[in-house]
């Protein structure tokens, strides 16, 4: 690994269809084998289904879903004197959003049958209503951090 200089962080451009940076991030995480147009179609179809079912703005629901699935704390392994402790640490905003999107996509893929757009729409609507596996994963992460609060002084 190079010790010279860290890679420059590229700005995330807003999605051309929805004019949202969050939508661009979601497309990138939905994409498989470099098929960006397919990922964009999946997100667009999912938003269409959300609009059909709720009648509200799908972009607002999407943002709410991501906010509800975003963890605030997580545990990280830290070795101290031969023992490994699960140390609770706060999650930076960018990392939290990335984790939420990753969970939303993975739990959408794990859902049964139907098209990916339908599975994604279902997971997003569940997350917006504080239900669904992505929100459950967030609660689980918070519980782990709470249980290991005693090791918080090992923070680095």
Swiss-Prot record:
CDD domains: uS7_Chloroplast. GO terms for cellular component: small ribosomal subunit. Keywords: Ribonucleoprotein, Ribosomal protein, RNA-binding, rRNA-binding, tRNA-binding. Coiled coil: none annotated. Disulfide bonds: none annotated. Transmembrane segments: none annotated. InterPro entries: Ribosomal_uS7 (IPR000235), Ribosomal_uS7_bac/org-type (IPR005717), Ribosomal_uS7_CS (IPR020606), Ribosomal_uS7_dom (IPR023798), Ribosomal_uS7_dom_sf (IPR036823). One of its GO terms (molecular function) is rRNA binding. One of its GO terms (biological process) is translation. It holds the Pfam family Ribosomal_S7. SUPFAM superfamilies: Ribosomal protein S7. One of the primary rRNA binding proteins, it binds directly to 16S rRNA where it nucleates assembly of the head domain of the 30S subunit. Is located at the subunit interface close to the decoding center, probably blocks exit of the E-site tRNA. PANTHER family: RIBOSOMAL PROTEIN S7. Part of the 30S ribosomal subunit. Contacts proteins S9 and S11. Belongs to the universal ribosomal protein uS7 family. HAMAP family: Ribosomal_uS7_B. This is Small ribosomal subunit protein uS7. It comes from Synechococcus sp. (strain CC9605). The lineage of its organism: Bacteria, Bacillati, Cyanobacteriota, Cyanophyceae, Synechococcales.
